Amino acid sequence: MNNYDDLPCSIYFKKPTVQEFVDQPRVFEDSEVPAFQEVLQLPQERTKPPVPSTQPIVAAVEVAKKKSCLSAPKPRKEPPSHPALRQKTVAFGKTVNVSQTVEGTSRNSKKVLASTMSAQNTTTTEEQAAENWRDAMKTELQTIRTEIQEETARRQEELNAQNLVKMQELMSNFFQKITIPKQQAIEPVEKDKENFHESPRQSRQQKPASKIASAREVIKRDGVIPPEALTIIEQRLRSDPMFRQQIDNVLADAECDANRAAYSPPPPMSEVRYGSGVNPALMRETLTVERSIRYDNGLASIDSRQWTNERRDNRAPDSYRTYEPDQPCHSLYQKGQSISYYPSEAAGKTTARNNRTGYYVEDSSDHEEDVVVNKRGQNYHEQAVPETPAERERRIREKYARRK
């Protein structure tokens, strides 16, 4: 509230209007570029014409400007151009000259700085000149070195070319000296004459070469070694142990293949043919040759099969025994001459055995290998002498009479 409103006065004063000021950017005095602040001028207040009233006018008061804190400030002075005359605001609002700050620009400091800079400039100039001289010398030396290398390479190439030409000349002369002129082709008539007058010694020397060539052709074509090649191979066997060992290896491989083929086990027999599932060798049954079993790809009886199995069983544990191939099993079956018999093992007699004829025989002598057949000794591995029908019938009757 304005205090002027309450005063009793015959002069009317207009209430002051508040002027709004636009915020201006703050200008620092230490900046290089001078900043000028626009000062807003307040318009002059005009005196309001007096209102006619009945009150008497006591006095005339001249309208004057009212000073207020909101009035525009005085225009700032332009900062001096000389840096020494400028002012700088330091901490706590204290304003001092630039010469009094740490960045001082006094004459002494300027002189010291100028002398130091001159000395540094002089030293830098000398070092730069020395560096430039060294660079120039290095460049010059590098150029000279490159020229020398190019000259040396060119001279070496010329020398190599000269040496190559000389070597070619020497080689051509050498080949001309050692070259033998080609002989003319001999006509067939003259060749026959030369062969006619050839000495027998030369002919003997040429014949073995032709025989060897023919032997080689025979070996390549037919795979047969001719007698001429056998003689040479025998001589090589006696003189060359490596060749002898190679031949021995070939023969050993062949022997191993033969033994493996002979010792190969027979195919397993099928048990399907036995309906009852019982081993036929243990059955008490009268068999005939017509009902015998095929064994080892041949017709054989049960006794023959059992005898062969026993021999194989006895040989199995003897691993150090040399290989002895089994004798082939031959059947003595003749059509229309079948005879019934009992197997000896099935009968339970260990002292009796069957001979190779397939008949039951009892050993009556001490000699195990001889069997009395037809009143004469005969090895039991040999084939039996054919009997007459009468002798066979009589022998069968005697056999069954003894068994009863």
Swiss-Prot record:
Major location (coarse)? cytoplasm
Which controlled-vocabulary keywords does the entry list?
A: Cell cycle, Coiled coil, Cytoplasm, Cytoskeleton, Developmental protein
What is this protein called in UniProt? Spindle assembly abnormal protein 5
How this chain assembles, per its entry, is: Interacts with sas-6 via its coiled coil domain. Interacts (via C terminus) with let-92 (part of the PP2A complex).
GO process annotations (BP): centriole assembly; centriole replication; centrosome duplication
Q: Give the protein's function.
A: Required for centrosome duplication. Essential for daughter-centriole formation. Requires both maternal and partenal expression, suggesting that it regulates centriole duplication during both spermatogenesis and early embryogenesis.
Annotated Pfam families: Sas-5-like_implico
Q: Which GO terms describe its cellular component?
A: centriole; cytoplasm
Annotated region described as Disordered, given as residue ranges:
192-214, 306-325, 376-404
Q: Where in the cell is it found?
A: Cytoplasm; Cytoplasm, Cytoskeleton, Microtubule organizing center, Centrosome, Centriole
Q: InterPro entries given for it?
A: Sas-5-like_implico (IPR048594)
Q: Where is the composition biased (Basic and acidic residues)?
A: 192-201, 308-324, 389-404
